[in-house]
Amino acid sequence: MTKDEALNFIRTVKSGEKSEREAIEFLRYFPFSDVGCAKIDTQRALRNGAGEVIYSEGKTDDEILRIAEAIGARGQNILITRTNERVFERLREILPQVEFNARGRVISVKFKEPALTQSYIAIVSAGTADGAVVEEAYETARFLGNDTRKFSDAGVAGLHRLIANLEQIRGAKVVIAVAGMEGALASVLAGLVSVPVIAVPTSVGYGASFGGLAALLAMLNSCANGVSVVNIDNGFGAAYNASLINHL
């Protein structure tokens, strides 16, 4: 429940549109809804501005669906990350408006389309191989109501590709830099823009990249100002933080 939805609910009870019994039934789900396999945080949007997101890894398909159905039953938009096509196909049987970004492994269900911000988030990626992380970040940012623009395959091996889009990137309120290998893109971008850069190291690379650890350490040790770093392959975390900045 968002702050606006809470205020609207209070008004309907006050005006008599909803009875006291209906109010009690509604409030029964606070502060969480227990569905057996999970306790859904029904107040998170009220506290943080965005509702609970379902992280799929480690959960069975049945558990994911049970949680999604419980969130959807309250009319709240649903975002599921690190998921699969099996969940999408089963969810589509009960929620026809469901969307699935297969590369980003993200499912979204929007009962109410969020109004997009006037300012935008730029997602800049070093290579095509970083695409899965880019798509996770993109779907998350859009779900949270952000105008979001992607600039793909613009890594340091060909700086002219980055420079060609620099004017648009500089127009963003916050930049997400997605890169594997040595992770140099974040530092280069931070030296060219005057907005926060959120760096996402990816697990793309050969042996000595250690599954993204080399990029993570390089980004943490950036000489350029304004770089903050999230965990390896964490497109969701980068987009969530970027959304908070973009909504300021």
Predicted regions and their residues:
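Glycine-rich phosphate/diphosphate-binding loop of Rossmann-like nucleotide-binding domains
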Residues: 117-158
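Short glycine-rich or small-residue beta-strand-to-loop segments that form or flank ligand, phosphate
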Residues: 53-54, 120-126, 175-177, 229-230
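Short glycine/serine/threonine-rich phosphate/pyrophosphate-binding segments
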Residues: 62-64, 130-135, 159-160, 179-188, ...
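Glycine-rich oxoanion-binding loops at beta->alpha junctions
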Residues: 106-110, 147-168, 213-214, 230
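Glycine-rich phosphate-binding loop
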Residues: 164-202
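Long amphipathic alpha-helical segments
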Residues: 1-84, 88, 93-94
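C-terminal binding/interaction regions
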Residues: 125, 167, 202-248
